[in-house]
């Protein structure tokens, strides 16, 4: 589920820093969420300044935001590669392992983020933690709801079917699936848990992003901290 915290200014700083990794002519994966939206706005400014880029959106909401920002769009089926993906995170540790899916777009996000030559994570400093502990979203085929929940419970999760807020019934993703939010407490071995979740028949995608992110731009009150896969850190 979505976490709260972090100012709009921190998100703006993270988004603007991430756009520095985008070159003229790039195909850019466009993530979902409030900090990814800040990056989309910054990309829109780059387009207005003359950059020739095309975006590949990860959700209907992202598509609409990109159109408003003036970013030309394409579909992943229409390109043979993605140069850079910029996406947010609900929680991130120093190894750049992420929990995503607060916006229920993690299935599409994982495809696009993994396809990109470089995946840049944007977040405010409230999302940076030593140990991941947020509930892990698991998108599931509706017909597999009962057996998937049983398997998730057997892994030690406290499992909640995500409910819609503006209608009765569960949240339905852009791909027509339901979402379980799975609380495991402190996640000491994200790679092993990711493997176990992926092996459950009926799951479509889970929100653990392991060994995918190349760079994280973390907005702070004083600037932006940049983390790389080797855990080097800088501030701008």
From Swiss-Prot:
Listed GO CC annotations: cytosol
CDD domains: RPI_A (cd01398)
Enzyme Commission number(s) from the entry: 5.3.1.6
Molecular function via GO: ribose-5-phosphate isomerase activity
Pfam families per record: Rib_5-P_isom_A
Purpose of the protein: Catalyzes the reversible conversion of ribose-5-phosphate to ribulose 5-phosphate.
Protein name (database record): Ribose-5-phosphate isomerase A
Source species of the chain: Haloquadratum walsbyi (strain DSM 16790 / HBSQ001)
């Amino acid at each position: 589920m979505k976490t709260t915290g972090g100012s709009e200014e921190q998100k703006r700083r993270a988004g603007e820093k991430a756009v520095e990794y985008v070159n003229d002519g790039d195909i850019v994966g466009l993530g979902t969420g409030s900090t990814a939206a800040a990056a989309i706005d910054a990309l829109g400014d780059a387009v207005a300044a003359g950059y020739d880029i095309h975006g590949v959106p990860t959700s209907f909401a992202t598509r609409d935001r990109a159109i408003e920002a003036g970013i030309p769009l394409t579909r992943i089926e229409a390109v043979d590669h993605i140069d850079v993906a910029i996406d947010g995170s609900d929680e991130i540790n120093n190894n750049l392992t992420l929990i995503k899916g607060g916006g229920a777009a993690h299935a599409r996000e994982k495809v696009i983020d993994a396809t990109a030559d470089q995946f840049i994570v944007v977040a405010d400093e409230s999302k940076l933690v030593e140990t991941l502990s947020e509930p892990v979203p698991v998108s599931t085929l509706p017909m597999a709801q009962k057996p998937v929940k049983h398997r998730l419970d057997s892994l030690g999760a406290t499992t909640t079917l995500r409910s819609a807020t503006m209608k009765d019934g569960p949240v339905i993703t852009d791909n027509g699936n339901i979402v379980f939010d799975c609380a495991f407490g402190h996640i000491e071995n994200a790679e092993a848990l990711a493997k176990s979740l992926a092996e459950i028949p009926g799951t479509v995608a889970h929100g653990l992003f392991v060994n995918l992110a190349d760079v994280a731009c973390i907005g702070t009150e004083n600037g932006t901290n940049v983390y790389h896969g080797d855990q080097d850190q800088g501030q701008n």
